[in-house]
Amino acid sequence: MNITKENTLLFLGDSVTDCGRDPSGEWYLGEGYPNMISSMIRVQYPEHKILCINKGTSGNQTRHILSRLQEDVLDNHPDVVTLCIGINDVWRFYDRPLTKKCEPGVPIDEYRSNLESIIQQITENGAKMILLTPYMIDSNPAEPMRTTMLQYAEVCKELAQKYDLELLELQPLFEGLMAKGVSSYELSADRIHPSHKGHTAIALELMKKFNIV
């Protein structure tokens, strides 16, 4: 995916993307992979004027992304959008199934519909996209939430293929690192939110997909 010297790169998602960013999305990009990528681009291509914007928001599901898409994404007219969403769509079925104090989980058919609408609106606005699949940093195939998460990841993969989008599969990325001896606890303390090492892995894989010219 080509990124030219005056492009705008926007990171969209939930807490995995947010990582304590400045509310504006531009000044401080948080402690995660968006900041790492912005730093790598700035150091490797100092002559470029690539604007990086972080619009990750903690707790977001696809429902929330849809509700803020115009203001946070389309109005910024990005050239490239990375989207990491779906974890909270699944997680709320497992961590808070009975509470009424937060959004409930998003059924998979609604997830598909929401995600497809997000993709359509962003691409029709002229941006290229990279989808990051939902994941759970747990190698136990019998873990129920992991099983569900992978079903949502399949939806993400299907839509990436349908709309000819770039795809970064995070479950295989983390499982590959664990297979090589990296502990799951090195990658995440709670199996969802990446550690510095986990974010580094994401940032490096995304940088491989960017052809900065």
Identify the meaning behind each predicted range.
Residues 2-28:
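Short glycine-rich His-centered loop
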Residues 29-37:
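Short N-terminal amphipathic alpha-helix/helix-capping patch enriched in small hydrophobics
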